[in-house]
């Protein structure tokens, strides 16, 4: 009976240790986010609100990760006149000027045709796991599924292009 109790205690301790240990996915995400921080990203978990999609009564909210790059200093006049925008990957009626499969959350009909063409070129070049793109006077953001490091570098290039082009 004593051996049974000792075996039960040992098995329960091993089970508790295994339960607390991070999974392969957790280790991958920790390494990816450390690399993102090294590259200058701010990584934030937040709820992304989608526009109301075609055939759906209510807009959905998704918990996702935003990878952000700060714009740096821009002058006050440019900051005050900035046209913030956010697009998401979904089928919606608010899609004027965007590629198929993308819709506006903020900024529809506010940007020039030239800026829309630049945005569409960026959207076409993004990895499939990116579900949204955002631009404010403070930062540019990509919301994505954290698939692999190569995609993160591709996203960084796209966000740097957005900063350079003042999108």
Residues of each region from the PLM?
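N-terminal signal-anchor transmembrane alpha helix of single-pass membrane proteins
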Residues: 1-39
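Short alpha-helix boundary/capping motifs
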Residues: 3, 7, 53, 60, ...
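A short linear-motif detector with a strong N-terminal bias
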Residues: 21-23, 44-48, 111-113, 119-122
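Intrinsically disordered, low-complexity boundary segments flanking structured domains
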Residues: 27-32, 52-55, 120-121, 127-130
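Short extracytoplasmic
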Residues: 41-60
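Structured extramembrane domains adjacent to transmembrane segments
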Residues: 59-158
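Extended, compositionally biased alpha-helical segments that mediate assembly or anchoring
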Residues: 166-167
């Amino acid at each position: 009976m004593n051996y049974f109790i000792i075996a039960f205690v040992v098995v329960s301790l091993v089970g508790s240790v295994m339960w607390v240990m991070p999974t392969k996915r957790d280790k991958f995400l920790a390494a990816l986010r450390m690399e993102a921080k090294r590259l200058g990203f701010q990584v934030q978990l937040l709820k992304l609100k989608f526009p109301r999609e075609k055939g759906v009564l209510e807009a959905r909210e998704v918990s996702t990760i935003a990878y952000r790059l700060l714009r740096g200093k821009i002058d006050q006049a440019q900051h005050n006149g900035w046209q913030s925008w956010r697009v998401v990957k979904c089928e919606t009626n608010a899609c004027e000027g965007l590629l198929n499969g993308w819709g506006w959350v903020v900024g529809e009909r506010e940007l020039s045709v030239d800026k829309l063409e630049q945005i569409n070129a960026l959207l076409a070049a993004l990895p499939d796991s990116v579900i949204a793109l955002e631009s404010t006077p403070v930062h540019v953001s990509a919301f994505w599924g954290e698939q692999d490091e190569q995609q993160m570098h591709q996203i960084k290039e796209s966000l740097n292009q957005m900063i350079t082009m003042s999108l």
